[in-house]
Amino acid sequence: MDYQKISDLLVKLILLSRQESVHPVRRTAAADAAYLYSELIDRDVDTMHYKQIKSDFVNAINNLKYNPGEYITSLETKKDKQYEIFQ
């Protein structure tokens, strides 16, 4: 597991969650994603599952930051529920 990449993603999520210019729903989503992603550091997960989770969160980060008019879907790792986050 690449802890440096996870740490970098966590920093981006935490910064997004604290930006006043970001929509409150997005800030909450970023904070929730950071919490879930931080659990990966302490959890031993299957490599393919990890890659899928990482891909989902990278897409979520990019969409939160660059595509404000579109909703994003991210996976909650514990319950595999889907969340749709709107502007």
Residue locations for each model-derived region?
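General helical secondary-structure elements
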Residues: 8, 14, 22-23, 50, ...
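Generic L/I/V-rich hydrophobic alpha-helical segments across diverse proteins
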Residues: 10-13, 30-38, 57, 61, ...
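Amphipathic alpha-helical binding modules
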Residues: 52-87
